[in-house]
Amino acid sequence: MSIALQTAGIHHLALRVTDLARAHVFYGRTLDFPIVLETRDSFLALAGHTVLVIRRVQPETTAGDRFDASRVGLDHAALACGSETELERTAAALDAAKVPSTSLRFDPVLKRRYVAFTDPDGIAWEFYMAPELELAVADD
């Protein structure tokens, strides 16, 4: 039996980080995502229409633990990019800010360009060409 889940997309993405202050600088200043709520152990940032919930690691987290895309679970998160100009500007800005990233790449399966980068905990992100999604958001 099919559940036939109907959704407009991801509401929020929750990430655990080892250093909340460092993550606040990365997401709030480096990526310039608006911080909309802060608590002692977390903050919420807006990535377009998606809420990022950034939380401290749990006390039982193994010391030195880092994100690993090869484990079962999240491989990476991709943010939609609406124009080639913005993609190129972002790739250059990541490089200038010394954020670990790839150069602009081409996905041969979906035939789209993107740039991949990591946050200070090694959490993998992509900024991925999807102009049709940007147009849909602009029409909301």
Enumerate the predicted regions with their spans.
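Core segments of cupin and vicinal oxygen chelate
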Residues: 16-58
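A short, polar/proline- and glycine-enriched secondary-structure boundary/capping micro-motif
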Residues: 34, 56, 63-66, 136-139
